[in-house]
Amino acid sequence: MQKIETFWHFCLKHFRQELNGQQFNTWIKPLKLEVCPDEKNTLILIAPNRFVLQWIKDNFVTRIDEMAQDHFNERISFRLELREPAESEAQTVRTSAQKNREDKKPAAEKTQGVTSRKTNPSQLNASFTFDAFVTGKANQLARAGAIQVAERPGIAYNPLFIYGGVGLGKTHLMQAIGNYVLELDAGAKIRYVHAEKYVSDVVSAYQHKSFDKFKLYYHSLDLLLVDDVQFFSGKNRTQEEFFYAFNALIEAHKQVIITSDCYPKEISGLEERLVSRFGWGLTVAIEPPELEMRVAILLKKALAEKIELDENTAFFIAKYIRSNVRELEGALKRVLAFSRFTGHSISLDLAKEALKDLLAIQNRQISIENIQKTVADYYKIKVADMYSKKRVRTIVRPRQVAMAIAKELTQLSLPDIGEAFGGRDHTTVLHAHRKIIELRTSDPGINRDFNALMHILRG
């Protein structure tokens, strides 16, 4: 094995240790090492598309250079190249898609029950665009993947699976892809459908014995967006029909986008053959927004609604409303309604008055002691273990979860949280919080536990 090949294996080993599973599989794993006899001392990596290439340049080149210094005690030549599908192949895919639209559209328009809304056959909300989507650490990977899919539907990542809690922007991001594609190609056959509506379409086709028409419609789409796929759980005939539609679209290089409230393998009552297919493309999570992102969301929403909202007031609202974007926007609407009712302009004092009941409920329910007891009960350990010096894994991980939740749900400083956990240093709390954030993207069990505990504590 040449020294460059050995070095790249060295890099892969370290990246696996440094990155969570999702990050490694998305950015590093797709890179291909190219060995050139004339450039034996040059690391040449081939990126599958421009998106990955740019991301590597922006985020990993410096780290690769550092690894080279460690491995060789000197810098090496390093080059990133793009190896996209041949233009003729891409053109063939586009021509085939256009031909399928022309061939199948007349028949699809006759389909009963699934194309009745002629004014908006795609069922897309035009306000859900990438420009209107506020980006932060919690959703930047999901947004980046969505843009790549929008620019190269059926070629980039297929399917795209987006998961996360309620009200975090999954539907917005999914429909932004559809609106982007529709803007570039007004003739594209796109359908956004909530999983419950898809179930209803299956039932209707069964009642009217019209499965041929049902299949003709769903199998002829260029872009299928299925929201909240967890509602397919236990519905065997629906899963069977979706399985056939999924296969037909993927084989025809048509794009499938799916959302769920949890990781694919965590969806109970879903056939294994569907779960495995959901993993064929890119699976990305959307997490609850961090403070800065929540402030940005409020300010952007206020601007769109022509509401005068200063940063101090936005910061106050964002500081206390942490769960999801929907509740954040709900709090803003409450402040706006209170402003109109009282005849006073929106200010920090008015926001405090408008939200006092909501804040009182939150403050009453969530204390550090409550968090410790809830987490201890959940993991079946003693509350005393939360502030003990024990280092066994069965206690360390729940303790880290409790610290992370305390940072999210209380107004205590890091030193105060550390003090409540047996006089630990603030850096221990910070490490615990970062560790749990990292594990939530790579360990479905930890993510499930964290979400369940947050739900319990918020009531």
Swiss-Prot record:
ATP binds at residues 167, 169-171. One of its GO terms (cellular component) is plasma membrane. Residues 1-74 are annotated as: Domain I, interacts with DnaA modulators. Residues 89-98, 112-122 have a biased composition (Polar residues). The keyword Cytoplasm applies. Residues 74-122 are annotated as: Domain II. Residues 99-108 have a biased composition (Basic and acidic residues). Residues 340-459 are annotated as: Domain IV, binds dsDNA. Keywords: ATP-binding, Cytoplasm, DNA replication, DNA-binding, Lipid-binding, Nucleotide-binding. Its main location: cytoplasm. The keyword Nucleotide-binding applies. PROSITE patterns: DNAA. GO terms for molecular function: ATP binding; ATP hydrolysis activity; DNA replication origin binding; lipid binding. Residues 87-122 are annotated as: Disordered. InterPro entries: AAA+_ATPase, Chromosome_initiator_DnaA, Chromosome_initiator_DnaA-like, Chromosome_initiator_DnaA_CS, DnaA_C, DnaA_dom, DnaA_N_dom, DnaA_N_sf. It is found in: Cytoplasm. Residues 123-339 are annotated as: Domain III, AAA+ region. GO terms for biological process: DNA replication initiation; regulation of DNA replication. Domain I is involved in oligomerization and binding regulators, domain II is flexibile and of varying length in different bacteria, domain III forms the AAA+ region, while domain IV binds dsDNA. Plays an essential role in the initiation and regulation of chromosomal replication. ATP-DnaA binds to the origin of replication (oriC) to initiate formation of the DNA replication initiation complex once per cell cycle. Binds the DnaA box (a 9 base pair repeat at the origin) and separates the double-stranded (ds)DNA. Forms a right-handed helical filament on oriC DNA; dsDNA binds to the exterior of the filament while single-stranded (ss)DNA is stabiized in the filament's interior. Belongs to the DnaA family. Oligomerizes as a right-handed, spiral filament on DNA at oriC. This is Chromosomal replication initiator protein DnaA. It comes from Nitrosomonas europaea (strain ATCC 19718 / CIP 103999 / KCTC 2705 / NBRC 14298). The lineage of its organism: Bacteria, Pseudomonadati, Pseudomonadota, Betaproteobacteria, Nitrosomonadales.
